[in-house]
Amino acid sequence: MASREDELRNCVVCGDQATGYHFNALTCEGCKGFFRRTVSKSIGPTCPFAGSCEVSKTQRRHCPACRLQKCLDAGMRKDMILSAEALALRRAKQAQRRAQQTPVQLSKEQEELIRTLLGAHTRHMGTMFEQFVQFRPPAHLFIHHQPLPTLAPVLPLVTHFADINTFMVLQVIKFTKDLPVFRSLPIEDQISLLKGAAVEICHIVLNTTFCLQTQNFLCGPLRYTIEDGARVSPTVGFQVEFLELLFHFHGTLRKLQLQEPEYVLLAAMALFSPDRPGVTQRDEIDQLQEEMALTLQSYIKGQQRRPRDRFLYAKLLGLLAELRSINEAYGYQIQHIQGLSAMMPLLQEICS
């Protein structure tokens, strides 16, 4: 027979062993996670049995509606659930504190992960930007205004833009397909992750070409300015507000002076985002993203950096969230530039 002390340690919702106070009630980890997930959804569950279902350790999964109601009756509060951004920031700060308290050294698995990412990056994206010159470039894009004699006739900038964007997305696809952990996922999840992250990875890698002094992208013999983005099409280009947001992002990221392993780990974190639409194996992908995040934290901690860079990981998390917003705005822009989406069906599919 359970003692009074044992009962006080049990989850007030299902009776399982409690791990502490979560959202204002003593609950187990299972009910804590259930409450956070369920409350975050826009549509709540409904009970087919008039709200009279048993909620116990063995029966708690049978009726989400009754389980949620019991959570609320037990005193769990919706207003105590952090937003995804606040939760990510809190985790970053907790990880930062742990990193400052103990010396961090990369494990063999983390070193192998970095080697794998760097190898795939070198094979498929290492010389990507130098190859832009192959794609029907307008003459004015040349830094010294001296087009090579073998160039094709000058074409509208929209044609060149469509070419290089399609090329970058194809290289990103090759990069991801070269990662064993990515190939191990169901093909449906691979597609969902690529649709969500391809543009973000393109911009993370493109940042290595951004020049802070001139505010241009220097890709081999070509340069790209904010004015080029505004006149992609003869009739309309990217909105100035969007371009200013994009160039501000690249300037902020470039100022952090990331090393190549940090760039590829940041790209991997963007790739393995479990909240992309259409993803089915969310727990597995969440674990992969956590693995990338922990490796990035360990790598940053192991570098001899300036004191002002002690919050580098938290800054990168903030930039990832900013890049997500840019990605959404980019898709909208692509659809509204005359003739652009029709010229690059692959990117149109990615942004749809």
Swiss-Prot record:
Q: Which InterPro entries match?
A: NHR-like_dom_sf, Nucl_hrmn_rcpt_lig-bd, Nuclear_hormone_rcpt_NR1, Nuclear_hrmn_rcpt, ThyrH_rcpt, Znf_hrmn_rcpt, Znf_NHR/GATA
- Where found in the cell? Nucleus; Cytoplasm; Cytoplasm, Cytoskeleton
Give the induction annotation.
By dexamethasone.
Instruction: Just give the chief location class.
Output: nucleus
Q: What PROSITE patterns would the database entry show? A: NR_LBD (PS51843), NUCLEAR_REC_DBD_1 (PS00031), NUCLEAR_REC_DBD_2 (PS51030)
Quote the entry's note on domains. Answer: Composed by a short N-terminal domain followed by the DNA binding, hinge, and ligand binding/dimerization domains.
Question: What exactly does this protein do?
Answer: Binds and transactivates the retinoic acid response elements that control expression of the retinoic acid receptor beta 2 and alcohol dehydrogenase 3 genes. Transactivates both the phenobarbital responsive element module of the human CYP2B6 gene and the CYP3A4 xenobiotic response element.
The record's comment on protein family reads: Belongs to the nuclear hormone receptor family. NR1 subfamily.
Q: How does it assemble?
A: Interacts with ECT2. Heterodimer of NR1I3 and RXR. Interacts with PSMC4. Directly interacts with DNAJC7. The DNAJC7-NR1I3 complex may also include HSP90. Interacts with CRY1. Interacts with CRY2 in a ligand-dependent manner.
Please state what the protein is called: Nuclear receptor subfamily 1 group I member 3
What lineage, starting at the top, does this entry show?
Answer: Eukaryota, Metazoa, Chordata, Craniata, Vertebrata
